[in-house]
């Protein structure tokens, strides 16, 4: 994973602001590289343009730290690459993926139809990424995010063009690059009309309607004699195989972290609410990892004085954190994991915020601005800056949970009955269960849709959710978590896994036609629940869904009247 910053200016090379450089280095602490070059637009007497490329690197692929930006000295072309190309053209990538991508792009630039060839290379990539590629021969800038928008890329057209993993400021000119295609900017045209709007090239040139240019949505309604989902249903066996295949490149061969302790060989951590989606990932990851590697489970809980006051719980009491829904389910699922995989070295990291060592109530911070609390105030402004251009109370609630979870510092224990001690995870890879609710009917609105109009209404609702995956706030989440020099990976959003899920008949994923009273397991995400049961986790299989901001209690800390759509006050 990397940090990207690119500027195109008319008058001179633009320096990188120090705060931006610092944030980029937080994302990629292993290397900082800069390349400057001039572009000579192919329109006669136009003045040259000044291009500055900056990349920082978090080295997670290959056997060495690969320096960026990539640059081809003879041509002057350059690439800033932030992502993980798990496959190119359907084939697994060996070694460093950025090097492989740049090699293919330079070969494509030599072809007669170079623009189409460059687009074809990028279309063939499977995995999360954001990139900026300068094709010097044609004076074109090509940039974008993967079709699911799993990595951050922002742009600003004030006084030139800036492309960056993070915003330099909270100026309203910063916007997200949409994950709707590959953007190609002809610098010859842009030099004459820099205000011209960008238009993307499509991710796919295939005819026919597809979801996210990945697969065709299955609209088939269940036949009258459709068998109810059981543990032996083909889709339960298939989801285990598909999810395992998705996990393999994401958890295997992760380099040893720089802060490696010989007594603690831990390279993978899980954003762990104790819910169904993340616990299944942890359980399957345990099947894949070598026996000497540990798995850290990061569970975050916030002190919410509004709820504490309502419940009559002391804001200074330990029970504030232990009463959080995600802490309760986290401990329960942790116990189940240690029971079904006793040989694995599990570690539950309880991240409580504010830390228990601090006895100043968070109400003093948020509702009484005149009360100093410098550490928390500093974090608040940092989180607001990172999540920008998103700026609502809902954004802040979610970003808080992800930001402090990714920091990975808390009280840890290796067994439910073991003593706790302060701990910081060395793992640089975070696994997230995001995507399962959209694919398998896990939201509250899905049973409501079924009650309203049967399977037809349910299919329409799921299609809307899946179609919006590329427009989810994954860029915001990437900025919040990557700040700590860690990379989040989404096994449920693997392209091949998504393709299988959307092409699978709906009754083989969430058979709302068969009630919970018949099977003992609720219909939403039933295929995943049955997998959890097959993996020996009967309690996890019956766990209810909660949104992250409510499970960790970051929502409505100050007032129950606060709406998620309200704009925040920096």
Place the predicted regions along the sequence by residue.
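ATP-dependent adenylate-handling ligase core
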Residues: 301-420, 427, 445-455, 478-487, ...
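Cysteine-centered catalytic environments shared across enzyme families
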Residues: 1-344
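Hydrophobic/aromatic beta-strand patches that form the interior of the parallel beta-sheet core
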Residues: 132, 142, 162, 296-298, ...
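A structural signal for well-ordered alpha-helical segments within the folded catalytic domains
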Residues: 14, 99, 177, 237, ...
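Short helix-capping/linker segments at secondary-structure and domain boundaries
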Residues: 11-12, 91, 108-112, 140, ...
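Active-site- or binding-pocket-proximal scaffold segments within functional domains
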Residues: 91, 114-117, 121, 352-353, ...
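Mid-to-C-terminal catalytic subdomains of enzymes
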Residues: 422-570
């Amino acid at each position: 994973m990397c940090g990207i910053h690119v500027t195109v200016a008319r008058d001179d090379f633009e320096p990188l602001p120090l705060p931006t450089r610092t944030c980029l280095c937080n994302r990629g602490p292993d290397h900082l590289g800069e390349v400057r070059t001039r572009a000579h637009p192919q329109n006669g007497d136009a003045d040259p343009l000044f291009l500055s490329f900056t990349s920082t690197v978090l080295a997670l692929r290959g056997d060495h730290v690969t320096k960026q930006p990539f640059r081809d000295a003879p041509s002057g072309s350059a690439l800033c690459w932030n992502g993980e190309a798990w496959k190119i053209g359907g084939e697994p990538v060996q070694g460093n993926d950025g090097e492989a991508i740049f090699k293919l792009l330079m070969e494509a630039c030599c072809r007669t139809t170079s623009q189409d060839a460059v687009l074809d290379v990028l279309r063939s990539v499977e995995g999360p990424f954001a990139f900026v590629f300068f094709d010097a021969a044609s004076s074109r800038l090509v940039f974008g995010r993967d079709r699911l928008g799993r990595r951050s890329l922002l742009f600003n057209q004030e006084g030139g063009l800036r492309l960056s993993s993070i915003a330099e400021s909270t100026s309203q000119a910063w916007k997200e690059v949409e994950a709707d295609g590959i953007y190609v900017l002809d610098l010859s045209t842009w030099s004459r009309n820099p205000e011209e709007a960008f238009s993307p090239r499509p991710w796919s040139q295939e005819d026919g309607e597809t979801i996210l240019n990945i697969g065709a949505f299955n609209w088939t309604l269940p036949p009258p004699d459709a068998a109810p989902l059981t543990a032996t249903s083909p889709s339960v066996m298939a989801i285990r195989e598909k999810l395992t295949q998705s996990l393999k490149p994401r958890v295997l061969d992760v380099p040893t972290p720089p802060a490696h302790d010989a007594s603690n060989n831990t390279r993978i951590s899980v954003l762990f609410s104790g819910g169904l989606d993340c616990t299944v990932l942890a359980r399957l990851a345990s099947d894949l990892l070598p026996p000497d590697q540990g798995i850290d489970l990061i569970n975050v809980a916030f002190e919410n004085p509004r709820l504490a006051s309502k419940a009559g719980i002391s804001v200074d009491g330990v029970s504030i954190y232990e009463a959080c829904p995600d802490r309760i389910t986290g401990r329960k699922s942790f116990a189940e994991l240690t029971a079904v995989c006793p040989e694995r070295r599990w570690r539950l990291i309880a991240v409580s915020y504010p830390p228990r060592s601090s006895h100043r109530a968070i109400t003093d911070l948020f509702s009484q601005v005149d009360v100093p609390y410098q550490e928390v105030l500093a974090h608040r402004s940092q989180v607001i800056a990172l999540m920008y251009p998103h700026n609502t109370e809902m954004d802040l609630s979610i970003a808080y949970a992800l930001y402090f979870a990714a920091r990975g510092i808390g009280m840890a224990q290796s067994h439910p009955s073991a003593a706790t001690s302060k701990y910081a995870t060395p793992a640089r890879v975070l696994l997230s269960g995001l995507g399962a609710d959209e694919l398998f009917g896990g939201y509250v609105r899905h049973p409501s849709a079924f009650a309203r109009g049967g399977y037809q209404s349910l299919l329409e609702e799921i299609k809307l959710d899946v179609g919006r995956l590329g427009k989810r706030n994954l860029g915001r989440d990437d900025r919040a978590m990557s700040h700590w020099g860690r990379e989040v990976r989404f096994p449920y959003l693997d392209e091949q896994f998504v393709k299988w899920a959307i092409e699978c008949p709906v009754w083989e994923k969430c058979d709302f036609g068969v009630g919970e009273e018949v099977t003992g397991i609720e219909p939403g995400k039933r295929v995943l629940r049955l997998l959890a049961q097959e993996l020996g986790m009967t309690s996890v299989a019956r766990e209810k869904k909660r949104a992250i901001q409510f499970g960790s209690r970051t929502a409505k800390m100050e007032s129950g009247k606060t709406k998620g759509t309200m704009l925040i006050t920096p």
